[in-house]
């Protein structure tokens, strides 16, 4: 995970001070890319402990097309609570856009199902793209999509994924995002009969909040440990059939967690 540490180091050394929507203030760089070969291990940050339950359940929640936090809360995940309304609703956020993007003439598009079908039909397609950035729905979303567009790529029997993230909370959010999309890539690879390839993470505004700088220095003082391994239940052949117990991370031995406030 040196690539992640390099991102943190770059923001600290090159970042410009910017104001932001939350009023917290940030150090920010514009344009950065990381690449992880998933054959080398599962890219889970080891210099602080991450809450695996939240990462896995959030991805399953996205794939269900759900936009209410009830499922998350039932499974001990609170990462979306600050943005939910009194009924637990978040508006047409990620799950809605991934699974039922509204068409202007009526009806919806299931982008994830389309990708699965297109990989089977035409693995060389350059249209294997999912977007969560729907300008018509932004005003009704509790939080505009930060990780807003991703593309799959098939070559030599390997499935790779590139994510474009317009806004990236480098200390709290990015470790979750890396793990989530690496997991999605591995799950997609299994159900399409491919091997997991690279996960490429491309950023627009990558930033550290002003109240995360001390924690970032602490994390950078720690030596990364060997990456864990992901084990998926080989019996699962449909992406939408994956359950929490089908996803196991083995050999994760991180440094202790580092607490930091969430900018809302």
UniProtKB/Swiss-Prot annotation:
It catalyses: dUMP + (6R)-5,10-methylene-5,6,7,8-tetrahydrofolate = 7,8-dihydrofolate + dTMP. DUMP binds at residues 21, 126-127, 166-169, 177, 207-209. GO terms for cellular component: cytosol. Keywords: Cytoplasm, Methyltransferase, Nucleotide biosynthesis, Transferase. Pfam families: Thymidylat_synt (PF00303). It is found in: Cytoplasm. It comes from the Bacteria. Its main location: cytoplasm. Pathway: Pyrimidine metabolism; dTTP biosynthesis. The active site is at 146 (nucleophile). It is an enzyme of class 2 (transferase). Its EC number is 2.1.1.45. GO terms for biological process: dTMP biosynthetic process; dTTP biosynthetic process; methylation. InterPro entries: Thymidate_synth/dCMP_Mease, Thymidate_synth/dCMP_Mease_dom, Thymidate_synth/dCMP_Mease_sf, Thymidylate_synthase, Thymidylate_synthase_AS. GO terms for molecular function: thymidylate synthase activity. (6R)-5,10-methylene-5,6,7,8-tetrahydrofolate binds at residues 51, 169, 263. Homodimer. Catalyzes the reductive methylation of 2'-deoxyuridine-5'-monophosphate (dUMP) to 2'-deoxythymidine-5'-monophosphate (dTMP) while utilizing 5,10-methylenetetrahydrofolate (mTHF) as the methyl donor and reductant in the reaction, yielding dihydrofolate (DHF) as a by-product. This enzymatic reaction provides an intracellular de novo source of dTMP, an essential precursor for DNA biosynthesis. PANTHER family: THYMIDYLATE SYNTHASE, THYMIDYLATE SYNTHASE 1. Belongs to the thymidylate synthase family. Bacterial-type ThyA subfamily. This is Thymidylate synthase.
């Amino acid at each position: 995970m040196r690539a992640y540490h390099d991102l943190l180091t770059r923001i600290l050394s090159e970042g410009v001070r910017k104001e932001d929507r939350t009023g917290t203030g940030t150090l920010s760089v514009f344009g950065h890319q990381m690449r992880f070969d998933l054959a080398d291990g599962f890219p889970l940050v080891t210099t602080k402990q991450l809450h695996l339950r939240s990462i896995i359940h959030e991805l399953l929640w996205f794939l269900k097309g759900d936009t209410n936090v009830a499922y998350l809360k039932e499974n001990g995940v609170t990462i979306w609570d600050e943005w939910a309304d009194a009924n637990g609703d978040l508006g047409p956020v990620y799950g809605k856009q991934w699974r039922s993007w509204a068409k202007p003439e009526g009806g919806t598009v299931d982008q994830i199902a389309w990708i699965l079908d297109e990989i089977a039909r035409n693995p060389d397609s350059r249209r294997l793209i999912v977007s969560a950035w729907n300008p018509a729905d932004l005003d009704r979303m509790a939080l505009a999509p930060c990780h807003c567009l991703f593309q799959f790529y098939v070559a030599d029997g390997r499935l790779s994924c590139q994510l474009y993230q317009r806004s990236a909370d480098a200390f709290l959010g990015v470790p979750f995002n890396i793990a989530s999309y690496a997991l999605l890539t591995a799950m997609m690879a299994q159900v399409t009969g491919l091997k997991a390839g690279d996960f490429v993470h491309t950023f627009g505004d990558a930033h550290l909040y002003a109240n995360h700088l001390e924690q970032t220095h602490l994390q950078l003082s720690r030596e990364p440990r060997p990456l864990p391994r992901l084990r998926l239940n080989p019996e699962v052949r449909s992406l939408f059939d994956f359950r929490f117990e089908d996803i196991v991370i083995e050999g994760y031995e991180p440094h202790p967690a580092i607490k930091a406030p969430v900018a809302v």
